[in-house]
Amino acid sequence: MGKAYYVKFETPEDLVNPILEAVRVASTSGKVKKGTNEATKAIERGTSKLIVIAEDVEPPEVVAHLPILCEEQGAAFAFVPSKQELGKSLGIDITSAAAAILDAGDAQHIVDQVVSSIAKIKGGKTDQ
């Protein structure tokens, strides 16, 4: 099965673990919002450092607006293959379609590296 239509770029495998690690560390030492609705609000308010979106969300319409909104607002975003892994990184026992890192806490250097790497992949379009 191919990637969902909302996946705007291929996240390299060697970047997936740092993204999940950033979520894990930020959720304990910083501030992270869980879920699509919270991620949407963080983008609209301009408070997100990084939006993380799962690639295996069904139906895809649940998160399809997030990449578009991120591009409109200049917010950094990345994809991870599994909503299960994203939920686990958030420290919750259920899946999560999306998450927003508001304050990276001890993960700031990881978030900076991820945002920089994503900007290179996208051709420098990420403003953060």
Curated annotation (Swiss-Prot):
Keyword vocabulary terms for this entry: Cytoplasm, Ribonucleoprotein, Ribosomal protein, RNA-binding, rRNA-binding, tRNA processing
Gene Ontology cellular component annotations, sorted alphabetically: cytoplasm; ribonucleoprotein complex; ribosome
Stored InterPro entries: eL8/uL1-like, Ribosomal_eL30-like_sf, Ribosomal_eL8/eL30/eS12/Gad45, Ribosomal_eL8/Nhp2, Ribosomal_eL8_arc
Gene3D superfamilies reported for this sequence: 3.30.1330.30
GO BP terms in the entry: translation; tRNA 5'-leader removal
Domain of life: Archaea
Task of the protein: Multifunctional RNA-binding protein that recognizes the K-turn motif in ribosomal RNA, the RNA component of RNase P, box H/ACA, box C/D and box C'/D' sRNAs.
Complex formation: Part of the 50S ribosomal subunit. Probably part of the RNase P complex.
PANTHER family, per database record: RIBOSOMAL PROTEIN L7AE FAMILY MEMBER
Protein name in UniProt: Large ribosomal subunit protein eL8
Organism expressing this protein natively: Nitrosopumilus maritimus (strain SCM1)
